[in-house]
Amino acid sequence: MGGRNFRYIALDFETTGLDLHNDEPIQIGIMEFDLNGRVLGGFQSLLRPVKKETELKSIVGFITKLSIQQLESAPRPEEIIEEIQCFFGEDTIIVGHNISFDLHFLEKFFPGLKRKTTLDTFKLSQTLIHYPASYAQEVLIQQLKSKQSYQKLSVQLKIDEEEHFHDAFYDAKLSASLFLYLIDRIRTLISAYPVLGVFLGESESFLKEIFAIKESKKQSEIDLPPLKKITPPHTQMLSGSYNIDLEKYDNYKRYGVGDISFKELLSSLACHKHSIFAFSNKSKLDIAKNLLNDLGIKNLGFVKEEQTLSRSALKKFANKGSFTGAEISFLLKYFSHLEQGLGVLDLNSKEDYEIYTALKDTRQEVDYPIILATHAGLFSILEQQEKYEEYQIFFFDSEWRYKSFNLYLSRPYDLNYTLNYLEMLEYKYRLITSYGEIEEKRLTQLIEFKQFFTVFIGILGQETKKFFTHTEATQLTLEPIKGNVAFYQTNKLLEKFADYEPQLREIITQQEFSSVWNQIEHMIKIFDGNLQVEKKMYDRSAFYFIYSEEVKFSSWDEFLELFRERKALFLSHTDTTLPCLISEPEDSKINKEQQKGENQIFHLSKTASVLKAIEAFDKMQFPNGAIFILSVKKEESKELFEALIKKGMDQDFLLLVENITGGSGKNLFKAKQQGTKIIIGGYAFLLQLFAQKVAISELIIYNNKGKQQDLIFSDILRYGKENLA
């Protein structure tokens, strides 16, 4: 199978870190293969970095399994370039997972090596593998091991189970196996839906060359089959653990929930149809969702758009005649969902959202019995006064009200968010214009505004940059931008927004205009007063700025103004002075359960004490147990991680550290695996584990400084009770 005789090589580097400017490769792996899964050759070598051994922390050795001492006698990159030149040429296709990272090190340390193109298995996986825990290669491979088609490839490529991830040659093998699996998926989809071959033939996608597909004339108009939308049954709690008569409670009043278990409280409140449950963060929302699902309530609403595709827009899109690489990826994703019976597209790239924005149907509001929201999500609903106005609001975590509301009021504004939205609209209206449905003049006006906004971002960035020229600070407080001579050019452009408003209102829909203009008005409001400016880094040399109002300090009365003409009760699980929402239960199971949880929580601030506690952990009693070490300070987490490695605890436990051993998705996936684990992370990561139903055998509070430490501890007991094994 295949078109021209391309040479396929999988490439992987192990490096001293993730910093593209300062880190170096310490191992290279190359494997040449063909599209039939045959291994044609390969190369692997350790590489000696310039960094001294003392600079290479033990964490590098832990993650890569390489001995730092081994690197001392390894060759430098320039010493092996002649050995690897044979793999590269004008017909070479380089395959890899997140290949741009490896490509950077290839071009920097092995300059001049030629290639035809690169193919990223990370991006291809986002197109063809749906809803994984993470798109980390290790997680994807674990997920695919149960599939017969992948098992066959694994045997062909001689992937040894005893080899490990973070070995360059082994990871190159895995990239090749993942690529071949994904190519086979595309082949299967083309066989099942021949129209995909027609689309590829009309495209710019390099997949067209791999599959040797030639452009063919369509015999008739194409009408894509609809996705199979699965709607959960409409269920509602008829009776809960406690009878709550809302007529007996005062609107806008705060109530304590005492020692009632979270699940019992949810079951009691869920009896009231048309309710919004609002929580201080998404992890708590996910915990509530899981408990409600356990209670049989699955038709839950969320504060986000219901995904629907317009049948007519989809048909026009399918018949437009030529497709970009991004559009082909979207069509592949669509047919992959169709084949698997998935009704909601797993949108996970900017290009996905651009195309979806152009194809989505006008939203029809669904009548959900219960809607789950974060505090911030609820605040955005309340600003749209007509939305869900008949719903009863239960505002959980009212003790976090002060922080969540003030953060919402002073929420930062990222101009790139607005620019991305304008680019989505440009794609939509460019598509509509190509159908002849609107005058090209309207598209031209939209592009003109987008270009003006792009210039505005550049001028504002240049004038902001001056304040950060002679300081290492990444956050500054500035006087109002409006009328500020230091922002002369910015102010000249700010005046022009008013001229664009009526024009923009005419060329896009009312909903789209509201979305854009609300962002513009939020920006202008920020610029009217003293503001915080934060410098965010793309990498070591590129940066951008986000802007926010100075932190607001709102009173309870100001907070309640947002809820005017709404029905709302505010619930606290910490304030014992408040009247109780529910009378104390006759038994005290919850107290016993809480005490059980508290018996497994240790407050230890010294590394030696933590190591001693871990050594005393009974692995026989908890063979799949997890010790969670709560640490909110990144450097202290790193130091503790190194101490665990030096103590050899990585031999007895799986070590997971937030933002060191992987992103949250990868670490959450590993936390569910068999065997004993030590997990180091912050409060938010702990709540994510609770939301994923990961049992915590022991909780060590290592460092938890700050004004909210009592609230955090209370949250752990409240939301983690079910998970403290």
What residues fall within each predicted segment?
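Acidic two-metal-ion nuclease catalytic site recognized across multiple nuclease folds
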Residues: 2-3, 176-241
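Conserved non-catalytic scaffold segment of RNase H-like nuclease domains
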Residues: 2-116, 130, 134, 138-150
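Acidic, Mg2+-coordinating catalytic module of metal-dependent nucleases/exonucleases
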Residues: 93-100, 104-109, 139-208
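A contiguous, basic/glycine-rich beta-loop/short-helix subdomain that forms a polymer-engagement track
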Residues: 242, 353-364, 379-385, 487-597
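A substrate-engagement module of RecA-like helicase motors
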Residues: 279-371, 431, 437-447, 459-465, ...
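Signature of the SF2 helicase/ATPase Hel1-core->accessory helical subdomain module
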Residues: 290, 355-369, 374-492, 575-584, ...
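Conserved interdomain hinge at the start of the Helicase C-terminal
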Residues: 600-632
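Conserved RecA-like P-loop NTPase helicase motor core
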Residues: 660-725
